[in-house]
Design a protein with these regions (language model features):
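Solvent-exposed, charged interface segments at domain starts and junctions
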Residues: 1-2, 97-100
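Active-site recognition of the HExxH zinc-binding catalytic motif
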Residues: 100-113
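Mixed-charge, low-complexity intrinsically disordered regions
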Residues: 1-3, 8-9, 13
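Metalloprotease/metallohydrolase-associated module, dominated by Zn2+-dependent proteases
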Residues: 11-97, 113-166
Length: 166
């Protein structure tokens, strides 16, 4: 029950601050909601930007994904898809990066659900149209690619080969 209370409080906090500020990435969010509930954000964003079209989509943290910040996986029949967010890359980044990564992946999910677009790397005109629309409304800076290169490099696994007697 405590988890539900936290989700309700997080959603309530999100709604009340959203009414005061049009920007989803306003710096004050870092103090108001520094560790947001991604599921609550997903539901809010789905209603606000995608007319509820992503009801068949799930969002979850990936504890081992370190080569990208987010990924949208298409589950096939029925328009089901899953958004995975990199817990290692996003958990220590500003809230703004989580919001923009989630919205980026939600655009991919929306294009799949509405147009059956299965191009995971597709950032063409339809993607960019939605990206610009949301950036304008929410004052975000959703981009085609993230800039977490230092973090990705930090998580890269290195294989060492012994060149002498081991």
């Amino acid at each position: 029950m405590a988890g539900n209370d936290r989700n309700s409080a997080s959603t309530s906090s999100f709604r009340s601050h959203e009414e005061q500020s049009d920007s989803l990435v306003d710096p004050s969010w870092e103090l108001i909601d520094p560790t947001p509930d991604v599921h609550a954000m997903f539901l809010q964003f789905n209603d606000r930007f995608f007319d509820g079209a992503l009801a068949g989509c799930e969002v979850r943290w990936s504890p081992r994904m370190t080569t990208c910040a987010g990924l949208c996986c298409y589950e096939g029949r029925g328009g089901l898809c899953s958004i995975r967010l990199s817990q290692p890359l996003l958990s220590l980044r500003p809230r703004k990066d989580l919001v923009e990564t989630l919205l980026h992946e939600m655009i991919h999910a929306f294009l799949f659900v509405k147009e059956r677009n299965r191009d995971h790397d597709g950032h063409g005109p339809h993607f960019q149209s939605h990206m610009h629309r949301i950036n304008h409304i929410a004052r975000t800076n959703i981009t085609i690619y993230h800039s977490f290169h230092a973090e990705v490099a930090n998580f890269k696994q290195h294989w060492w080969r012994c060149q002498g007697a081991c």
